[in-house]
Amino acid sequence: MQIFPAIDLKNGQCVRLFQGDFSKKMIVNEDPIAQAKAFATGGATYLHIVDLDGALEGRPVNLEIIQKMKEAATVPVQVGGGIRSLAQVDYYLDSGIDRVIIGSAALTNPDFLHAAVQKYGPKIAVGIDAKNGYVATSGWLEVSQVNYLDLAKQMEKVGVETIIYTDISRDGTLTGPNLEQMAALQKHVNIHLIASGGVSSRADLEALSQLGLYGAIAGKALYNGHISMSDVTEVENHAY
């Protein structure tokens, strides 16, 4: 299972949120370029970067920093946050980003998503963020009436190859991932699934790996030492 150390960017710094609440923001490193390099030096093989400013503004804000992070880390990176047009997708992928994550726009602008998938195939991932099983949009500020399983099925039909599923109620809480929802997703669609939110220990990563998932994202647990980079590399290389 691929494990993605997460770097969330706000005002040019690495931060962590609690349940997606921008008012509950904690700065974990003032230098995101150094953080990206540290994860890669520690053995990370793929980074997950979120432009939180971009998610709020609906356009990429931290492009320059993200490019420098990619250069410093020299490992593949996937980026999300505020990507709502094909021109923005083009810009990221043309600048060397390996995969872009389309969030709210997958629900609100299906034509854009379809065009992106047609053009770039596996370089497009969709982020499904849900609260109590219902999809949230606009930087998690609004909750729709769309069930996460229905949206995942819809994405599969469009040709999306990777879904990143975040249970907002677990994000940044260190309470463990929602294994039940991930198992339901795994049964519902036949595409790459990446679990996000709540990972608090090596045991959580092992449990997600045992579900047969393609990947998992680790954030706060890496920053506070609950998970080490050696845990990441060992779980990543173990067949469960």
Swiss-Prot record:
Highest taxon listed in the record's lineage: Bacteria
GO MF entry, a single one: 1-(5-phosphoribosyl)-5-[(5-phosphoribosylamino)methylideneamino]imidazole-4-carboxamide isomerase activity
InterPro entries: Aldolase_TIM, His_biosynth, HisA_bact_arch, Isoase_HisA-like, Isoase_HisA-like_bact, RibuloseP-bd_barrel
Active site: D8, D129
Keyword field: Amino-acid biosynthesis, Cytoplasm, Histidine biosynthesis, Isomerase
Pathways per UniProt: Amino-acid biosynthesis; L-histidine biosynthesis; L-histidine from 5-phospho-alpha-D-ribose 1-diphosphate: step 4/9
Catalytic activity: 1-(5-phospho-beta-D-ribosyl)-5-[(5-phospho-beta-D-ribosylamino)methylideneamino]imidazole-4-carboxamide = 5-[(5-phospho-1-deoxy-D-ribulos-1-ylimino)methylamino]-1-(5-phospho-beta-D-ribosyl)imidazole-4-carboxamide
GO CC term (a single one): cytoplasm
Primary location class: cytoplasm
Subcellular localization: Cytoplasm
Coiled-coil ranges from the UniProt annotation: none
TM regions (residue ranges): none
UniProt GO BP: L-histidine biosynthetic process; L-tryptophan biosynthetic process
EC number: 5.3.1.16
Family: Belongs to the HisA/HisF family.
HAMAP family cross-referenced by the UniProt entry: HisA
Protein name: 1-(5-phosphoribosyl)-5-[(5-phosphoribosylamino)methylideneamino] imidazole-4-carboxamide isomerase
